[in-house]
UniProtKB/Swiss-Prot annotation:
UniProt subcellular location: Secreted, Extracellular space
Cofactor needs: Ca(2+)
Catalytic activity: Preferential cleavage: Arg-|-Xaa, Lys-|-Xaa
Tissue distribution of the protein: Expressed in the pancreas, lung and kidney.
Residue pairs linked by disulfide bridges in the UniProt entry: C30-C160, C48-C64, C132-C233, C139-C206, C171-C185, C196-C220
Peptidase S1 domain mapped to chain residues: 24-244
SUPFAM superfamilies noted in UniProt: Trypsin-like serine proteases (SSF50494)
InterPro entries documented for this protein: Peptidase_S1_PA, Peptidase_S1_PA_chymotrypsin, Peptidase_S1A, Serine_Proteases_S1, Trypsin_dom, TRYPSIN_HIS, TRYPSIN_SER
Site positions per UniProt: Required for specificity: D194
Enzyme class per UniProt: hydrolase
Name this protein carries in UniProt: Anionic trypsin-2
Amino acid sequence: MSALLILALVGAAVAFPVDDDDKIVGGYTCRESSVPYQVSLNAGYHFCGGSLINDQWVVSAAHCYKYRIQVRLGEHNINVLEGNEQFVDSAKIIRHPNYNSWTLDNDIMLIKLASPVTLNARVASVPLPSSCAPAGTQCLISGWGNTLSNGVNNPDLLQCVDAPVLPQADCEASYPGDITNNMICVGFLEGGKDSCQGDSGGPVVCNGELQGIVSWGYGCAQPDAPGVYTKVCNYVDWIQNTIADN
C-alpha cells in the first residue's frame, strides 16, 4: 500500500486505483435527520466528513487536515440552505501524534469548535465505543462522496450504506502487510456495496456507537478489497484526554 499512498490525501476519501472515485456504492439516500452526528468539513467546498461527539468536538481522519476548517452541521442537502444548518469555525485541529501519512496508521484527528453547537433533532452527538465491535456487527456508513466510478457526480443528499465489520483475518488477507491493529475492514468480500470511502473522515456507526472513521481502500466495491477504517475503540482514552487538556 505504501507506494499507492503517494496518490492519497487530496481531501476526498483515499481510494485506489485512481480511476475509481470515492463514493458510496450500493447504498441509498439517508432519511433526513437520521444521521444527526454527520458533519461536513468545508474549506469553501465540502472536502471531508466527520462525526460530532459532543457539543464542541468533532472526530475526523488525520489525512483530512487543513489549517482552517469550517464545520457544517445539520446538513442533508449540502448545496441548499435548508434552515437547520449550523456553521461553526474550528478553534483547534489536533491530529494524533503518531499519525503516519504514509501508512495511514493512527488516521484520526479532533476538531474543537470555536463555540458549542445547539443540539437538537438535526444536530446530535454520537457516543464513543464502550468496547470494540466484533466481526459480523452491522454498521451504518454515510457521506457525500462521488457516486460514479468514472467521472464526477457529487450527490447533494447524504448517502448511506449498511455493511458488517469483517473478521480481522479477512481484512489482513485483503491487504497483506498493510493492516495495523488500529484498522478495521467493513464491507463485503464479494464486493458490490462499499463506502469506497464515501467521504474521508466520515462515520461508521455500529449499534449506536462510533466504531470507525473512513480512511482508505483499494478501488470501489471491488471483490476482496473492502473499505478500511480507523478503529475508534483504540482511541477512546486519547480522545477523552485530548478533550480534557484542551
